[in-house]
Amino acid sequence: MATGDVTLSVAVEGGVTKTVAIDSATRVLALAYETARTSTFPDPVNTDAEWQALMVNYLADHIVLNANRQQEVVSYTPKTYTAAT
């Protein structure tokens, strides 16, 4: 990996870790997209740290959303997570 590349990993406790790498040019373009998309928001995404938090929270959001969709099939308390900052 080169400086600025991104590594995304999902680890299951007691299991294996799956990892993908994204090159720095892709990260720069993705950040530019989010900066433009959120430019009118009260807290726009302008930095790598803000983009990282946005991406990790996006992934967590989808995992929790999919889990909570199973309420129709099984009975349990809806799940939540603590967002990264």
Stretches with model-predicted labels:
Residues 1-85:
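Viral virion structural and adsorption modules
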